[in-house]
Amino acid sequence: ILLKNGKIYDGTGADAFLGNILVRGDRIEKIGEGLICDGAQVIDLQGLSVSSGFMDAHSHNDWFAIRKDPRPFFEPFIRQGITSFITGNCGLSATGFTPDTPYLDKIGGGLFGYRGDETSVYPSAGALLDAADGRSPCNIAVLVGHCSARAGITGFDGRDLTPAEEEQMLGAMEKSLKEGACGVSLGLMYEPGLYVSIEELKKVARLAERYDLPMTVHPRACSAVSMTYPLLGRPPLLRALDELVEITRGTRMKLQYSHAIFVGRRSFRCKDELKEIIY
């Protein structure tokens, strides 16, 4: 296929330029001006723009990737130009748990989940990434979710883990990091992350730091009033950020705060202090 006369944005940040693109099979073979190819199907893009695919940097589409036929779920994204996804966010990954878990129904925190014959089960990232590479029409990177790893050990039980359970959880997460997971995610607003101690979260943070990989965090609160914290005192969304500072104190790890949002008008007054803490 020869795409002619398009305004090309190559994704590097360089200025757009007019040119042609030669596609052979599922690969771009050449980009440039004046390209010709005998026998190629020619599509004239006069007046149109062409770009590299867009990336959705905060996605939960690993839960589509585990579908036995994921293509219908990805088609709407492709039609919008989105071709790559960072998945496994908010601690709720579709992978990263012990393979013999009796709590498969708890993986996904109640927001997502395995759905019988419609989905395949991938306890570690390597298996999921291999399956996605063969079946998904899009590029998938996956974070290993702390909520999923913990739920695989004790379900939604709110107690502290025993040393043996903690070792199992961290071992399942580390296995996925070794197999190509791109980082770790926490979901402190969701079960079971909602109940977890600072000390447990520090150990998860150290795991990510050891592999020099990022940790993304959905905090316990994004509002000025939250049942997660006492009603009086410092606004909950700032307490939630204080918690992340404590978890990562003394490390040189990469931390992504997701999401820096202000729920409710009373939370707006916190924006300046939140920015000061982050920066």
Show where each model-derived region lies.
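Divalent metal-coordination and catalytic microenvironments
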Residues: 6, 21, 26, 47, ...
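Histidine-rich, glycine-flanked metal-binding segment
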Residues: 8-53
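Histidine/acidic residue-rich metal-binding segments in metalloenzymes
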Residues: 127, 160-187, 191-279
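Short, glycine-/Ser/Thr-/acidic-enriched flexible segments
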Residues: 8, 28, 92, 147, ...
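Divalent-metal coordination cores built from histidine and acidic residues
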Residues: 69-183, 212-213
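Structured core elements
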Residues: 2, 22, 56, 86, ...
